[in-house]
Regions:
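Non-cysteine beta-strand/loop elements that form the S-adenosyl-L-methionine
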Residues: 66-68, 77, 172, 329-336
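General structural feature for long, well-ordered alpha-helical segments within catalytic domains
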Residues: 3-10, 23-34, 63, 97, ...
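Structural motif
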Residues: 63-66, 115-116, 142-145, 197, ...
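Metal-dependent amide/peptide-bond hydrolase catalytic core
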Residues: 197-373
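Active-site beta-loop-alpha junctions enriched in small/polar residues
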Residues: 19, 70-72, 122, 150, ...
């Protein structure tokens, strides 16, 4: 297989048909057609979504290794107000890698077990992995390999991170309900802004274990949009929570909800708080991590291996491990001189570096299939 020719042919086609979450219709059709022509057993519309799976079966007993790619893009607003779909997070690169791995594995053949390509929608809104889990796409999988192109300051071309330690993140929003009154008679009302300000101060006074990287930020505070001489009766408030520990994240959520509800009561207001979205932190398997590091070093040399890296971003791939604890997962970071940053409409990268990812993931898959139970 000419890997560079594969990249040059496939990436532009996927880049040109960028589609947002759960609308990856053309993208999914392209992937399904490509994989079916390789002889994979393709299942489309998994869980009633654009998700698809493709299986290559050796016909011999052994583990099932999943190679996961995301499919969706981001939407950017143009000057005329229109929304433009752009692959600014590298999912076009991820799909190009997955198809390259699928093709190499088909050419090499499998000694035992099965390979399952997971083409996942809606990563950008954190719902695609859960949709595939709910549809049973991971029920027959023992190993799952994820990966992401990384900014240049984390990994350069010729380097691969063996494990990205993604952070757990939770978005929460609440509503504070007071009682409206005229500004000349504040004692007859309940000022939701007063309660909200106290909530923000209480949130800022929380101190989490610095070794776990926990943080809570107030990211929304909206209220009092009416007259300036009216006591505000409603405030909308929002929070961004982060932690490297899934256990600590549960505690942070509890604390935020307690503060919002109980602080509002002190001011005579009512409040509620709920989760809008969440992603768990990465949980690496030690034995798989060691094997991944070994494979990267063998392919790229010692200078090409970055053993692990922490990042404060969330990734819904981590739901696979959280919902299937017996699953062994790895999340690799692909160095490709990516600039200026992810989620920038002008993001660009070294396409030739995708060949490293294709080779490493193919070799890692083959090594896993050779692991003796």
């Amino acid at each position: 297989m000419d890997i560079q020719a594969h990249i040059n042919e496939v990436w532009p086609k996927l880049h040109a048909i960028a589609e947002p979450a759960f609308k990856e219709v053309k993208t999914a059709a392209f992937l399904a057609d490509f994989l079916r022509k390789l002889g994979y057993d393709v299942t489309e519309n998994v869980g009633g979504t654009t998700a698809l799976t493709a299986v290559l079966d050796s016909g011999k007993p052994g583990p099932t290794v999943a190679v996961r790619t995301d499919m969706d893009c981001l939407l950017f607003k143009n000057e005329d107000g229109s929304l433009e779909p752009i692959h600014a997070c590298g999912h076009d690169a991820h799909m190009t890698i997955a198809l390259g791995v699928a093709k190499l594995l088909q050419e090499q053949g499998l000694a035992c077990g099965r390979v399952k390509i997971l083409c996942q929608p809606a990563e950008e809104i954190g719902r695609g992995a859960l949709a595939m889990l709910e549809a049973g796409a991971l029920d027959d999988v023992q190993y799952a390999l994820g990966y992401h192109v990384m900014p240049k300051d984390m990994a350069r071309s010729g380097q691969i991170i063996a494990q990205i330690n993604w952070t757990a993140c939770t978005l929460m929003e609440g509503e504070i309900r007071g009682l409206a009154a005229h500004g000349s008679q504040p004692h007859l009302g309940v000022n939701a802004i007063d309660a909200g300000a106290a909530i923000v101060n209480a949130i800022n006074a929380l101190h989490s274990n610095p070794l776990l990287g926990g943080s809570i930020k107030t990211t929304r505070f909206m209220g009092g949009a009416g007259s300036l001489n009216a006591i505000c009766d409603k405030v909308s408030i929002g929070f961004d929570l982060r932690s490297t520990s899934n256990t600590e994240m549960l505690e942070l959520r509890r604390k935020v909800e307690d503060i919002v509800v109980n602080t509002a009561k002190v001011y005579g207001a009512e409040a509620d708080c709920h989760i809008v979205g969440t992603c768990p932190a990465a949980e690496a398997d030690p034995s798989l991590l060691a094997l991944t590091q070994e494979v990267i070093s063998a392919e790229l040399g010692a200078g090409g291996l970055i053993p692990a890296a922490n990042i404060t971003v969330g990734e819904d791939f981590n739901f696979f491990k959280q919902e299937r604890p017996q699953l062994k997962t790895a999340s690799l970071g692909i160095g490709c001189n990516l600039e200026p940053r992810l989620h920038d409409r002008d993001m660009h990268f070294d396409h030739s570096a995708l060949a490293n990812a294709i080779n490493v993931l193919t070799n890692l898959t083959q090594r896993i299939l050779c692991v003796k139970p």
